[in-house]
Amino acid sequence: MTKMSKGPRSGSRRVMTKSVKNKGMPKVNEMMKTFEVGDRAAIVINSAVPDGMPHHDFQGITGVITGMQGSCYILSFKVGNVEKKVIAAPVHLRKVQ
């Protein structure tokens, strides 16, 4: 038998697929988005950009921007009673009202 892969993208076939009209690299504006501390944002992974990509388990999670680390943003949210922080590039985040 073969061994199961254990890479960071394993088990993410449905999460990281893009529709035909959205394939390819994102626009420059998408990569240069800015957020303020306190803004609400959702994690929407763009599979064309591997830099600053959060783990695919966090796809669709909504949280609050709490700061920056380099050119990436720190997104805080709760899972049950546990406070979690994810570092993600702006291309993988979408503003939420």
Swiss-Prot record:
InterPro entries: Ribosomal_eL21 (IPR001147), Ribosomal_eL21_arc (IPR022856), Ribosomal_eL21_sf (IPR036948), Translation_prot_SH3-like_sf (IPR008991). Disulfide bonds: none annotated. Gene3D superfamilies: Ribosomal protein L21. GO terms for cellular component: ribonucleoprotein complex; ribosome. Keywords: Ribonucleoprotein, Ribosomal protein. GO terms for molecular function: structural constituent of ribosome. One of its GO terms (biological process) is translation. Residues 1-23 are annotated as: Disordered. It holds the Pfam family Ribosomal_L21e. Belongs to the eukaryotic ribosomal protein eL21 family. This is Large ribosomal subunit protein eL21. It comes from Picrophilus torridus (strain ATCC 700027 / DSM 9790 / JCM 10055 / NBRC 100828 / KAW 2/3).
